[in-house]
């Protein structure tokens, strides 16, 4: 059904967006000012080798703080995927440390399996790029996907399905997830709703560090802005949010700092309030030299 047609010369980004969603909408992405809290994640000298024997991550060092969104930018294949998986304990680390705040100190999780990381008291939530391959099991419903994350907390031989069912009902209402019900396999949901299920499950467990990889890829405008709002809510709660993105406009608006990767290495860390897209673009091809902004 044709909603509206306009002359190219008369079209604007705002008017086209409103025509697509059928209502007036603001395209501004909020960046709430939140006082940065303690260091929650320290990565030092991280190096990872891929299956071809090539360094996918090369001597990466950075710190993430509570109450900030650290954007991670780079040309596709610059080590973003491997870096995220190494931080989550899912990728072999050749050298370096990945330390999370746990209790009164820091725990290095390099060499630990995911369940060992959990036992160390590390509070990490990871929303991977592959939503239905790594993040969720498409053939399972919301409740079972929630249980995958929480079953180890279950006491006794019987699995409690009532509590996760209640949580799923709450997530459906709070995140405006469009689904026939909690018993529907998640693969039948739209991309935006799948992402809401995945992100909703992860933030339900109140992580200290939230890492999201391309969270709005393929989503419509309404779903994208809902995701941005959720990330900002976590930031306000004092969570350290790592946001791997491919849209520089979005990263420049929502991030407190942007770390740029080039060839698996950090080419610079900039403050988007003072840096330009051109600055970030040059760092993505390592043509701008080292540039750093202290938090």
Predicted regions and their residues:
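Glycine-rich phosphate-binding loops of nucleotide-dependent enzymes
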Residues: 1-295
């Amino acid at each position: 059904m044709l909603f509206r047609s306009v002359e190219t010369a008369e079209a604007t980004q705002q008017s086209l967006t409103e025509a697509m969603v059928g209502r007036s909408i603001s395209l501004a992405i909020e960046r709430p000012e939140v006082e940065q809290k303690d260091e929650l994640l320290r990565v030092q000298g991280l190096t990872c080798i891929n299956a071809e024997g090539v360094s996918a991550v090369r001597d990466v060092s950075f710190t993430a703080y509570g109450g900030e969104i650290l954007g991670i930018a780079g040309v596709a294949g610059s080590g973003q995927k491997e870096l995220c998986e190494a931080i989550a304990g899912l990728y072999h680390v050749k050298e370096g440390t990945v330390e999370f705040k746990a209790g009164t100190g820091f725990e290095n999780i390099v060499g630990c399996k995911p369940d060992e990381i959990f036992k160390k008291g590390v509070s990490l939530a990871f929303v991977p790029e592959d939503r239905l391959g790594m993040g969720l099991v498409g053939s399972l419903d919301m409740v079972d996907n929630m249980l995958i994350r929480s079953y180890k907390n279950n006491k006794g031989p019987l699995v409690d399905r009532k509590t996760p069912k209640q949580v799923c009902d709450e997530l459906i209402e709070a995140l405006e997830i469009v689904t026939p019900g909690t018993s529907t396999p998640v693969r039948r949901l739209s991309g935006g709703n799948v992402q809401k299920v995945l992100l909703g499950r992860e933030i339900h467990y109140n992580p200290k560090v939230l890492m999201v990889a391309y969270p709005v890829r393929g989503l419509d405008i309404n779903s994208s802005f809902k995701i941005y709002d959720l990330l900002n809510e976590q930031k306000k709660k004092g969570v350290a949010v790592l946001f791997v993105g491919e849209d520089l406009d979005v990263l420049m608006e929502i991030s407190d700092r942007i770390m740029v990767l080039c060839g698996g290495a950090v080419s610079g860390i900039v403050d988007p309030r003072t840096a330009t897209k051109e600055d970030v673009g040059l760092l993505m091809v390592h043509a701008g030299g080292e540039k750093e902004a202290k938090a």
